[in-house]
């Protein structure tokens, strides 16, 4: 059911309406000047097809700001905040379930604030009015439907569905037996914060092994995935084992590793409900998922007679840079991670004549978890950043005698954005600071070992989301290794084909095949040197691979190894490196070797 809000602002003489027959808003274009928001345009998506909307208002002599919403990653527009005067809409700021845009426009002294939002719903269309510029804005809302992943396993027994009216889980009860999972039961917290005891799905009238997995919902712990095994033919299959993972911890495997492996998970989302089939055993299990939502802290510092700024929320932070003088922070710069791209933001006055230093974060293996700062009655005087690896940055600025300490953090969360205030009229110093937080995921289980080889080439990384290496393709020529390509196996036994790294037009091509699930890669030997006839181009000359069972032939030139990629007690599950039309460097991702 679609809900239409009233258009807020001043009434312009040209009314417009984008209607509500869209699935999501995908991109917003805002043209603005000192007079206010001059024009606006919205792009939408409907049944997977993009729809470009027209500009509403005039576009002469304006600044332009765009804000993209990635509906393919379950991002949707939740609200619009702004202000208006007699001259129309002056400022706008857009909030999705994942991020917040920068404030757009220039706030007037007598501006009236407004917000377009309906709890539990998303915006799918806009309407409003113009009179040369944008005068009013309203929206269409529809309910956000959780993503349903169909039940995996058999379909024998009673179909059950716990629904999606819960905010999270507190406890999961499972009993396993010789024939599979006998029953499962969930304890929930509803959206009003009340505990709710779920129904038993399966049979309780047999002996088995009980398992209980507790989830601390009050500490912002939430369920992100379920994996397990099912065995049997078609609709008669039975769930044999289950393992639950939250953003904080992973349960033991409840039951034996028997049959085919499966996983219930969705990137950037958490589980809010389950459904499936059960008879005397649990025969199948499916889930409902909703996006994980960032939170915003209050600002620490002085907000009076200052200008508001807000970077919004991103995937992570790669680097912070701070410029300061003896008594205040002058400029705060942040490099954010946004879907594989670096987004740069700067707040305050960029003054290169002052002291500047930076703090680099090893994202995604490291995140900022808190900021310890000091402030006096006028401005922020110092910052210190702390990370998930236990690192602490230097002190940016000075802790003066009249300063008071403050801490910005949210337990179990990572900092994914900053907001605050700075002094106007050319002063530029930071007067207040706050942060956007996102529940902290488990750090990548794999360890990334530094690549070995020569300089040159473009970086590449196959990642570490694999269980083992299945096959290696090596391209060689008379001067060394031309290219490599790896086939991997993921945790549900699917084959993942990696990219070609190097020259695809191979002169000679060789393969090294790992036999079965019991064989895994433990080390790589290699050598590198300058290409004959070149002064500085270093390439990999030779590679040799060792598994827990055997050693491969020597690929490339017959050369003595100059490096070894290996970590004791670990197996190789991924590769990274640098390449051009040759292979320049090679590195590995490793996991600890565990008993089968």
Swiss-Prot record:
Domain Jacalin-type lectin, residue spans: 2-143, 146-291, 294-439, 446-592
Renumbered residue ranges of the record's region Disordered: 1-20
Alphabetized Pfam families for the sequence: Jacalin (PF01419)
Molecular function terms from GO: carbohydrate binding
Superkingdom of the source species: Eukaryota
InterPro entries linked to this entry: Jacalin-like_lectin_dom, Jacalin-like_lectin_dom_plant, Jacalin-like_lectin_dom_sf
Keywords associated with the record: Lectin, Repeat
Family affiliation: Belongs to the jacalin lectin family.
The protein's name in its UniProt record: Jacalin-related lectin 46
Organism: Arabidopsis thaliana (Mouse-ear cress)
Name of the coding gene: JAL46
């Amino acid at each position: 059911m679609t809900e239409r809000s009233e258009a807020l602002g001043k009434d312009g003489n040209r009314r417009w309406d984008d209607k509500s027959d869209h699935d999501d808003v995908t991109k917003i274009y805002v043209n603005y000047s000192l007079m206010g928001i001059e024009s606006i345009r919205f792009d939408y998506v409907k049944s997977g097809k993009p729809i470009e909307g027209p500009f509403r208002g005039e576009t002469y002599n304006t600044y332009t700001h765009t804000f993209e919403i990635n509906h393919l990653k379950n991002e949707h527009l939740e609200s619009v905040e702004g202000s208006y005067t007699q001259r129309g809409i002056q400022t706008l700021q857009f909030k999705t379930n994942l991020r917040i845009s920068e404030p757009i426009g220039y706030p007037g002294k007598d501006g009236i604030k407004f917000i377009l939002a309906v709890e539990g719903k998303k915006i799918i269309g806009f309407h409003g009015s113009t009179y040369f510029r944008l005068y009013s804005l309203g929206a269409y809302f529809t309910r956000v439907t959780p993503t349903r992943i169909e039940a995996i396993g058999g379909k024998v027994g009673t179909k059950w569905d716990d629904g999606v009216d819960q905010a999270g889980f507190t406890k999961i009860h499972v009993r396993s037996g010789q024939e599979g999972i006998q029953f499962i039961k969930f304890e929930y917290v509803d959206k009003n914060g009340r505990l709710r005891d779920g129904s038993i799905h399966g049979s309780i009238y047999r002996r088995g092994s009980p398992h209980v997995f507790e989830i601390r919902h009050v500490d912002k712990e939430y369920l992100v995935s379920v994996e397990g095994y099912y065995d049997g033919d078609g609709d008669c299959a039975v769930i044999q084992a289950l393992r639950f993972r939250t953003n904080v911890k992973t349960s033991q495997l409840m039951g034996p590793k028997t049959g085919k492996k499966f996983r219930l998970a969705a990137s950037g989302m958490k589980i809010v409900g389950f459904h499936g089939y059960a008879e005397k055993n649990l025969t199948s299990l499916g889930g409902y998922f909703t996006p994980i939502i960032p939170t915003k802290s209050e600002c620490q510092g002085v907000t009076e007679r200052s200008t508001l700024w807000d970077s919004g929320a991103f995937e992570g932070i790669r680097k912070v840079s701070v410029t300061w003088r003896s008594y205040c922070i002058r400029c705060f710069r942040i490099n954010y991670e946004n879907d594989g791209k670096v987004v740069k933001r700067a707040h305050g006055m960029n003054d290169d004549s002052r002291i500047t230093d930076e703090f680099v974060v090893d994202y995604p293996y490291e995140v900022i978890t808190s900021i310890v700062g000091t402030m006096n009655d006028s401005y922020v005087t110092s910052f210190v950043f702390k990370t998930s690896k236990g690192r602490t940055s230097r002190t940016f600025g000075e802790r003066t005698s009249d300063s008071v300490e403050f801490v910005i953090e949210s337990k179990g969360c990572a900092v994914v954005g900053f907001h605050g205030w700075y002094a106007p009229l050319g002063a530029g110093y930071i007067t207040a600071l706050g942060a956007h937080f996102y529940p902290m995921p488990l750090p990548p289980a794999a360890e990334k070992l530094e690549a070995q080889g020569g300089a040159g080439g473009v970086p590449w990384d196959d990642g570490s989301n694999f269980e083992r290496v299945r096959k290696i393709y090596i391209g060689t020529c008379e001067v060394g290794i031309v290219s490599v390509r790896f086939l991997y196996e993921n945790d549900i036994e699917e084959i993942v084909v990696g990219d070609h790294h190097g020259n695809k037009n191979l002169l000679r091509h060789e393969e090294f095949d790992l036999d079965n699930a019991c064989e895994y890669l433990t080390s790589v030997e290699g050598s590198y040197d300058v290409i004959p006839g070149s002064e500085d181009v270093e390439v990999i000359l030779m590679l040799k691979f060792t598994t827990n069972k055997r050693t491969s032939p020597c690929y490339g030139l017959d050369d003595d190894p100059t490096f070894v990629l290996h970590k004791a007690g670990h197996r190789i599950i991924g590769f990274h490196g640098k390449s051009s039309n040759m292979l320049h460097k090679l590195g590995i991702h490793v996991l600890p070797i565990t008993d089968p």
